[in-house]
């Protein structure tokens, strides 16, 4: 399975009990296969579905002023995939596209049906997820402002070591807000430093 053993890149996923949504999707959902590059929702359209990723992964991308895709987030195996803010909360057109980063399978339901069920069953769920999403967005915003690209890379690798081996380099670079060339330089410097440290450790004192 794809990235099934990787720690959650989305911190809020570990702080919220998604069991009600998971159970509803498992009972009512339909299994849909997405080919790599296929979209769950296109930027500018309404997101119609909420689902659980059964295999593969999805990336959230938005177009910048140059028309280039910028990766803003991911949903991995076992995680919820949807446009929570624009789609689930406000029923507005999505500000991002949700794209299959690999061949993927999703158990999905209509977003309005899931919203109605969850609000009736767990009234505090919407507020809890919204609060955690805001906290995560604010934390990432501060990181982009105050930390260097190397510091952001080190933090990412330290917290989620599997990400480097399981995601394309250009997607990681985009998520970190740096160019592929910058990321290659950072990785090269980090690998060189690690090799040097290992050699020093082998020298007898």
Regions found by a protein language model. Give the residues of each.
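Glycine- and acidic-residue-biased ligand/ion/polar-headgroup-sensing regions
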Residues: 48, 52-61, 78
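Phosphate-/nucleic-acid-contacting segments
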Residues: 147-205
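Short, Lys/Arg-enriched N-terminal segment that forms or immediately precedes the first helix
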Residues: 132-143
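Cyclic-nucleotide recognition modules
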Residues: 71-129
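A cytosolic small-molecule/anion-sensing beta-strand core signal
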Residues: 35, 54-55, 76, 102
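Cyclic nucleotide-binding regulatory module and flanking cytosolic helices
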Residues: 2-31, 86
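Short phosphate-coordinating micro-motif centered on Lys-Gly-acidic
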Residues: 40-45
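A generic structural motif
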Residues: 61-63, 99
